[in-house]
């Protein structure tokens, strides 16, 4: 009994471990070693960049061979996504920036592609990597890595600050922090505290929401594979995978919508 628990525990820990590289020592990091700021999860970086390149290749192919008369199935599918995202931007964004639609499209499709990696059998790619390349651990779901989701959220946060300052100037931006919601000099400390918390909570919630949902979904697949024999895993994994498709699309949609809303808020002119 103890040995069974030990094997199952090791299986779960193995699939939740990233392939890590230490930039300081230029060596691969073993799972039992202490982490540092200079350690990169290179499997998350590899798959996120690979999926981004896949998106660019498909978009470039469709743009190059698109036709007006009789569009193909791939072109029609891409145009459907573009129309959907463009409609969301027109409904929710009230500024004039031409960056928002391409950014929203990129965020939406990229997150869907990253989330979809969770539908691949959890042992398939790690076993291939171990057998052919000697890679000890491989985690293929980038959106279940807090570093990836935080990096995306921080980029959105940086754009928010940029547009806040571009729209209102530095003085206007600072004024919105210290004179809102209570337009009294005595309330400046309270206003500043409330606004800073409100501002910083946006990237935190944006990153943790995506990470939490995808991490929990990945963990359920691992638990199914770890506790059930191989011949009975499909009874739980197939229904969960079907339900998980909804989570994959929904989380990408929520991230995109919040990105549009946050950037729309940053285009409002502050009026004291």
Swiss-Prot record:
The record's keywords, sorted A to Z, are: ATP synthesis, Cell inner membrane, Cell membrane, CF(0), Hydrogen ion transport, Ion transport, Membrane, Transmembrane, Transmembrane helix, Transport
Q: Which residues cross the membrane?
A: 42-62, 108-128, 140-162, 177-197, 219-239, 241-261
Gene3D superfamilies registered for this protein in UniProt: ATP synthase, F0 complex, subunit A
Look up the record and report any one GO term of the cellular component aspect: proton-transporting ATP synthase complex
Report the locations given in the UniProt record.
Cell inner membrane
GO MF annotation: an example:
proton-transporting ATP synthase activity, rotational mechanism
Q: List where this protein forms a coiled coil.
A: none
Give the primary localization class: membrane
Q: How does it sit in the membrane?
A: Multi-pass membrane protein
Alphabetized SUPFAM superfamilies for the sequence: F1F0 ATP synthase subunit A
Disulphide bridges, residue numbers? none
Q: Name one GO biological process term.
A: proton motive force-driven plasma membrane ATP synthesis
Q: What does this protein do?
A: Key component of the proton channel; it plays a direct role in the translocation of protons across the membrane.
What is said about its interaction partners and assembly? Answer: F-type ATPases have 2 components, CF(1) - the catalytic core - and CF(0) - the membrane proton channel. CF(1) has five subunits: alpha(3), beta(3), gamma(1), delta(1), epsilon(1). CF(0) has three main subunits: a(1), b(2) and c(9-12). The alpha and beta chains form an alternating ring which encloses part of the gamma chain. CF(1) is attached to CF(0) by a central stalk formed by the gamma and epsilon chains, while a peripheral stalk is formed by the delta and b chains.
**Stated family:** Belongs to the ATPase A chain family.
User: Per its record, how is this protein called by name?
Assistant: ATP synthase subunit a
Species: Blochmanniella floridana
Which gene is this protein's source?
A: atpB
């Amino acid at each position: 009994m103890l040995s069974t628990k030990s094997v199952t525990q090791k299986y779960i820990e193995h699939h939740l471990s990233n392939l890590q590289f230490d930039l300081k020592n230029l060596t691969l990091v073993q799972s039992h070693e202490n982490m540092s700021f200079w350690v990169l999860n290179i499997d998350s970086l590899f798959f996120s960049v690979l999926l981004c390149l896949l998106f660019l290749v498909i978009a470039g192919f469709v743009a190059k061979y698109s036709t007006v008369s009789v569009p193909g199935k791939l072109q029609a599918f891409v145009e459907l996504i573009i129309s959907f995202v463009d409609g969301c931007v027109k409904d929710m964004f009230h500024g004039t920036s031409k960056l928002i639609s391409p950014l929203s499209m990129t965020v939406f499709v990229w997150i869907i592609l990253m989330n979809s990696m969770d539908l691949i059998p959890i042992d398939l790619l790690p076993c291939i990597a171990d057998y052919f390349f000697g890679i000890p651990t491989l985690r293929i779901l980038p959106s279940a890595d807090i570093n990836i989701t935080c990096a995306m959220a921080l980029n959105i946060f940086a754009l928010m600050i940029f547009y806040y300052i571009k729209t209102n100037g530095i003085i206007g931006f600072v004024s919105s922090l210290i004179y809102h919601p209570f337009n009294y000099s005595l309330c400046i400390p309270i206003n500043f505290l409330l606004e800073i918390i409100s501002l910083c909570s946006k990237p935190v919630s944006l990153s943790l929401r995506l990470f939490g949902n995808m991490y929990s979904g990945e963990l359920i697949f691992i638990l199914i594979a770890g506790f059930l024999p191989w011949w009975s895993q499909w009874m739980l994994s197939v229904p969960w995978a079907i339900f998980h498709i909804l989570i994959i699309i929904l989380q990408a949609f929520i991230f995109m919508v919040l990105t549009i809303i946050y950037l729309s808020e940053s285009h409002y002119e502050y009026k004291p």
